């Protein structure tokens, strides 16, 4: 059966699939669809050795009107998903993520914490969007794109000052299997060819 915790707000016309879990305080707009086994509004539980510190409290997850959450997707508390969005099957959206309106986040995509995604963005199957990435409006992110945020790969304290994800400016297109190294900026309307490594 479906689990709906205390303080959840479901807009008119919402539908919930089998075994969906809606955590406390989560807010869904009108006519949202939540597919089977999706989990909405869960709290992050980092490993004891994690260097990413989670705030002691997070605001509830908010999802706009007519958005769809796929089967097995997990969307954390503290995030905002706009109207008319699609979060694909088996996709993970971490805490403190802001997703604009009319965004497609495809199947099996990971969006890490503190990411900003503008209106009209399309992120295709299997992409990895690392923490602290910004994707401006109307960008296209092809399948299996990988973004990174730590040039030191977990070594030395310098990484804490210098880590940061890519900034992908308005209307840019990033081809399949592209790898973007930390702190890269892709210009407005730029095109990055498939398989490129941008350093």
Where are these regions (language model features)?
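Structural signal for interior beta-strand "rungs" in well-ordered beta-sheet cores
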Residues: 2-199
């Amino acid at each position: 059966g479906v689990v709906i915790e205390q303080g959840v707000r479901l807009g008119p016309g919402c539908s919930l699939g089998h075994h969906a879990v809606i955590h406390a305080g989560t807010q869904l707009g009108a006519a949202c669809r939540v597919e089977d086994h999706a989990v909405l509004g869960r709290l992050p539980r980092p490993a004891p050795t994690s260097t990413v510190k989670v705030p002691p409290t997070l605001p509830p997850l908010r999802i706009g009107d007519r958005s769809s959450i796929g089967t097995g997707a997990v969307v954390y508390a503290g995030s905002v998903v706009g109207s008319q969005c699609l979060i694909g099957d088996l996709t993970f959206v971490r805490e403190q993520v802001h997703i604009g309106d009319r965004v497609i986040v495809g199947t099996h995509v990971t969006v890490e914490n503190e990411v900003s995604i503008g209106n009209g963005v399309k992120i295709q199957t299997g992409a990895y969007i690392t923490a602290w990435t910004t994707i401006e409006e109307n960008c296209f992110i092809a399948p299996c794109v990988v973004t990174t945020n730590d040039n030191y790969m977990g070594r030395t304290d310098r990484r804490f000052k210098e880590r940061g994800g890519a900034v992908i400016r308005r209307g840019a297109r990033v081809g399949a299997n592209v790898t973007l190294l930390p702190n890269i900026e892709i210009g407005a309307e730029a095109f990055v060819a498939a398989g490129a490594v941008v350093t």
